A protein has these predicted regions:
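Extracellular glycan-modifying ectodomains
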Residues: 1-349
Length: 349
């Protein structure tokens, strides 16, 4: 196997050096040395976007009934921002973003898109690397995209401020191969370090018993101990790979930042909401991951979310837990209670 792997690598390098061709299962060359993920046919399924945006609206209503703002953030792919460098002959039509904007408006979802912002910034700055990590923005892209998100959060919480460049130490790190590949490159990529990182306490280990999808199990619970941070909101953010290794762009903007890998976990949104009791909820997805491969059609369509219950109004109807058979299991910060309810019960509070 080792000799076969070496032979494939040599063949790949030979094609690159002699013919300027990238023979690779994951990556492809665009113009001017740009590297992208392999091109695919744009075939967005409108049924998915209807189900997805309808579910976002139900989540938004759930949050607003509890006086908690919900914000959806859609981040563009590299192929969208640097369309002019796509391989010759590939005609990109930006269908996903176009359909998403229509559906988000149709369902009245509170959202931002970073597409236009990053396209504009890309005219003067490198917001995605030329070669390294073709699937995500770089730290400059994360800086500008996050500030746009924080500006939206500030509409509800004026104490939240967009970042200044001076909030970070900025270095450049040399990368000598493509991500998850032995394909050689030589590119200096930006790395932003949060100057207030010393005030951030990670308490993720206190939630080890938290239920997470087996395929999407990244999470982080970060508490801001800087003086004055108690005035900031507590955020529950469902996020993808644009942020899963970039907590540093949000950790200092909130008093507590609870980050959950999105996709299937977002279908169980109310489970996390009830545990973390946030002041604000954010869902972030990348354009290329906003499809049925990541969010199940069945979950989006059939997930039930409890309506708000006015406890004072229904005080006479409340029943003691002791009336039902139940088990209690304590683990770290979480206490799991299993209750056997009567048939016909549709919701519990």
């Amino acid at each position: 196997i080792g000799m076969r792997t070496e032979a494939i690598e040599e063949y790949t390098l030979l094609n690159d050096k002699v013919f300027g061709m990238m023979i690779h299962p994951t990556y492809t060359y665009g113009k001017n040395g740009y590297v992208f993920f392999q091109m695919s046919i744009e075939e967005p399924e409108e049924t998915f976007f209807d189900l997805f945006c309808a579910y976002l609206r139900r989540v938004q209503d759930y949050c607003e009934e509890r006086n908690v703002p919900f914000i959806y953030c859609l981040n563009p792919s590299k192929i969208t921002v640097y369309e002019q460098y796509l391989p010759k002959g590939y005609h990109y039509k930006d269908k996903v973003n176009q359909i998403m904007r229509i559906k988000l408006e149709e369902y009245g979802v509170n959202y931002i898109s970073n597409e236009e912002l990053l396209k504009e910034k890309s005219k003067s700055e490198q917001v995605y690397n030329v070669k390294f990590d073709a699937g995500h923005w770089n730290d400059w892209g994360a800086f500008y995209g996050t500030n746009h998100l924080l500006e939206k959060v500030a509409e509800y919480f004026p104490e939240v401020k967009p970042h200044e460049i001076s909030d970070f130490d900025i270095d450049y790190v040399n990368q000598d191969s493509l991500l998850v590949s032995h394909f050689p490159i030589n590119e200096d990529v930006p790395y932003f370090s949060d100057k207030d990182e010393q005030y951030i306490e990670e308490i993720t280990s206190q939630y080890e018993s938290l239920k997470l999808d087996e395929n999407y199990h990244d999470m982080a619970c970060l508490v801001n101990r800087k003086e004055g941070a108690e005035a900031l909101p507590k955020v529950l953010m469902f996020q993808g790979s644009y942020y899963n290794e970039r907590y540093r762009f949000l950790e200092s903007s909130f008093k507590e930042y609870d980050a959950i890998h999105n996709y299937e976990n977002f279908i169980d949104f109310d489970y996390y909401f009830n545990i973390f009791q946030p002041d604000c909820v954010i869902l972030e997805t990348a354009e290329y991951a906003t499809k049925g491969n990541y969010f199940s059609y069945e979950g989006l369509e059939h997930k039930q979310l409890n309506h708000w219950l006015d406890v004072e109004q229904h005080e006479d109807e409340l029943e003691a837990l002791e009336q039902y058979p139940y088990d209690i299991e304590e683990a770290d910060r979480l206490v799991k209670i299993d209750v056997n309810l009567d048939e016909g019960v549709s919701a519990g509070y």
